[in-house]
Amino acid sequence: MSYSAYSESKVNPMHVVIMGCGRVGSTLANELQALGHSVAVIDQEREAFRRLGSDFNGKTVTGVGFDRDTLIEAGIEKAEAFAAVSNGDNSNILAARVARETYGVQNVVARIYDPRRAEIYQRLGIPTVATVSWTTDQIMRRLTPQGKASEWRDPSGAVQLCEIFVSRDWYGKPITLIEK
């Protein structure tokens, strides 16, 4: 089920700029539009915009997602959110930093493929989604038997949230007693 299916029907509309019109970018654009947001999508290839479908009524801009003129044409100056979801880690981080540092966009996220870079980018203040790590975690969760399958792991791997099944004897007991 999509994110919009879980969202409230009334939202405060915002302008969102998305760099990259692949499967993720086009799906994100359509989901945001369905929630009532105004959306501009940037891609270097004009053909990529076909993925948006005929119902998309947002703005499409052909260009490089960290180029000043391209960003201005996409409405970055009024944007409340920016998502960099192209197929290049470096381009995504550069575009996200430009959106945040040059144009003051507060809600910024960059997709990255190389999970080893995630911690570095987090230190730069750019929230990232490491698709390879996330996908691996989700597949492992479904493949491994009940137990300590990872539900979520932060990009650095320092924090991991796990779902475990506990005995009825543990109900209502403090964790300190269970650990013994």
Where would I find each of the regions flagged by the language model?
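Cytosolic regulatory regions of ion transport systems
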Residues: 1-180
